Amino acid sequence: MTGAPSARRSELSTQNRLTHIDETGAARMVDVSQKDVTTRLARASGRVLVSPRVIELLRGEGVPKGDALATARIAGIMGAKRTPDLIPLCHPLAVSGVEVELGVADDAVEITATVKTTDRTGVEMEALTAVSVAALTVIDMVKAVDKSAVITDVRVEAKSGGKSGDYRRTAPEGPDA
């Protein structure tokens, strides 16, 4: 029992610091070799604000460059798989599944990515990368029609598995929500 308060302090200090920075402030890749292999899932979302003309084209004849949503879906899947090549301290993982969904709203293309693995660390970065690459691809596909498209609201919506437990983003409350 004498070690319990010390262990709790250590756990709290670990939760309240950046794990990718060592004591001297240098970047490092976290050692996950002692973590349990568990099934982990993450879902992220984002939006690409586009002009009414782009919405009209996406709902109708399509944009001049081709099938924007199908291209963005494949790009998002590829992005999830390439995350450790793009994010320097991200661990290479055995990604076991990626789903990227795109929908056309009244003012935006809405993107959701779900990534799954059975590994030692989570797939939040893979889900965020999938959304981001899909969003960039939407912009590439519509730029001939709308040069002012904007990527917004890229965020983790939920995660499960692992030591830190489950997370689900809650909607903000209040009149401006």
Swiss-Prot record:
EC top class, as a word: lyase
Binding site for substrate: L89, C90, H91, M125, E126
Catalytic activity: (8S)-3',8-cyclo-7,8-dihydroguanosine 5'-triphosphate = cyclic pyranopterin phosphate + diphosphate
SUPFAM superfamilies per the UniProt record, alphabetical: Molybdenum cofactor biosynthesis protein C, MoaC
Pathway as given in its UniProt record: Cofactor biosynthesis; molybdopterin biosynthesis
Gene Ontology BP annotations: Mo-molybdopterin cofactor biosynthetic process
Keywords: Lyase, Molybdenum cofactor biosynthesis
Entry EC no(s): 4.6.1.17
Functional summary from the UniProt entry: Catalyzes the conversion of (8S)-3',8-cyclo-7,8-dihydroguanosine 5'-triphosphate to cyclic pyranopterin monophosphate (cPMP).
Oligomer status and interactors: Homohexamer; trimer of dimers.
UniProt protein name: Cyclic pyranopterin monophosphate synthase
Organism annotation: Streptomyces griseus subsp. griseus (strain JCM 4626 / CBS 651.72 / NBRC 13350 / KCC S-0626 / ISP 5235)
